[in-house]
UniProtKB/Swiss-Prot annotation:
ATP binds at residues 12-22. This is 7-cyano-7-deazaguanine synthase. Binds 1 zinc ion per subunit. Its cofactor is Zn(2+). It comes from Leptothrix cholodnii (strain ATCC 51168 / LMG 8142 / SP-6). The lineage of its organism: Bacteria, Pseudomonadati, Pseudomonadota, Betaproteobacteria, Burkholderiales.
Length: 235
C-alpha cells in the first residue's frame, strides 16, 4: 500500500473511537503523532488508559510502531473553569431544554482542533484526525460534518497553510466502527479496544462487560454496548 507522505496528528483520548482512528491513520500515513487534552474531565482515567493503548499498539503491531511517533498532552483545564457540564462536574446526566445532553461541553472540539492545529503547525503535520461522528452521537453541534468542514477552512486560512481534518467515523454507526477496527487490525485490535480503551462518562472501570469496561448505564456505555451487540449480530 502506498502511504500518504504527510504527517498526521491524531486526537487520541484513549477511547474506542480515537483508537480506531489512530489505527486508521497508521495504515495510511508515513508518520503519525498523537495528542490528548487534560481539561478537567470527570473521566480523567482515559488519560491513563491511552498510555496503555499506545504501549499495546507498539507491542502488538510492530509495522504500525515504526510509524507511530511522539505523543503529546496539553493542559486545557481552563475549559472546566468556563463550562458547567456533566463531563466536568459531578452531576446527573440529563437532557437540557435546548435538546442537548448536559454532557455537551460548549466549544470543546473547536478548542481541541484549534490547539491541535497549532501543535501540528509546529510539528510540520498537515493532517488532523478525529473521531467525531454525526451518526450514533448525542447531537453535539461541534461533531457535525459541516462544522468541521468550516473549521478546516478557517484553520487553513488562519495558519496560511493547508490543514486537513480527517474524520473516518463521521458517517459510521457504532457497529460499523467495530467492523472498521476488525478490518484494520483483526481480532487483536478488537480485543485491545475491548480490554484497554475507555468510554464511560463516569470513569468506571471496575465492571468488565463483553464490550469493555464501564458503568453500563451512562449514554456512552449504552451506545458502546448497543454498537457491540449490533456488530456481533451482523457478523
Amino acid at each position: 500500500m502506498n502511504r500518504d507522505s504527510r504527517t498526521a496528528l491524531v486526537l487520541f483520548s484513549g477511547g474506542q473511537d480515537s483508537t480506531t482512528c489512530l489505527a486508521w491513520a497508521l495504515t495510511r500515513f508515513a508518520h503519525v503523532e498523537t495528542l490528548a487534552f487534560d481539561y478537567g474531565q470527570r473521566h480523567r482515567i482515559e488519560l491513563d488508559c491511552r498510555l496503555t493503548v499506545l504501549a499495546q499498539l507498539r507491542e502488538q503491531f510492530p509495522d504500525w510502531a515504526e510509524r507511530l511517533g511522539a505523543d503529546h498532552l496539553l493542559d486545557l483545564s481552563l475549559l472546566a473553569q468556563i463550562s458547567d457540564t456533566a463531563l466536568t462536574t459531578e452531576r446527573e446526566i440529563e437532557l437540557q431544554a435546548n435538546g442537548l445532553p448536559n454532557t455537551f461541553v460548549p466549544g470543546r472540539n473547536l478548542l481541541f482542533l484549534g490547539m491541535a492545529a497549532t501543535l501540528a503547525y509546529r510539528r510540520s503535520a498537515s493532517v488532523l484526525v478525529g473521531g467525531m461522528c454525526e451518526t450514533d452521537y448525542s447531537g453535539y453541534p461541534d461533531c457535525r460534518d459541516n462544522t468541521l468542514k468550516a473549521l478546516q477552512v478557517a484553520l487553513s486560512l488562519g495558519l496560511a497553510a493547508p490543514m486537513t481534518i480527517e474524520t473516518p467515523l463521521m458517517f459510521l454507526t457504532k457497529a460499523q466502527t467495530w467492523t472498521l477496527a476488525e478490518d484494520l487490525g483483526g481480532a487483536p485490535l478488537v480485543e485491545l479496544i475491548t480490554e484497554h480503551t475507555h468510554t464511560c462518562y463516569l470513569g468506571e472501570r471496575g465492571q468488565r462487560h463483553a464490550w469493555g469496561h464501564g458503568c453500563g448505564h451512562c449514554p456512552a456505555c449504552e451506545l458502546r454496548h448497543a454498537g457491540h451487540a449490533a456488530w456481533l449480530g451482523g457478523r
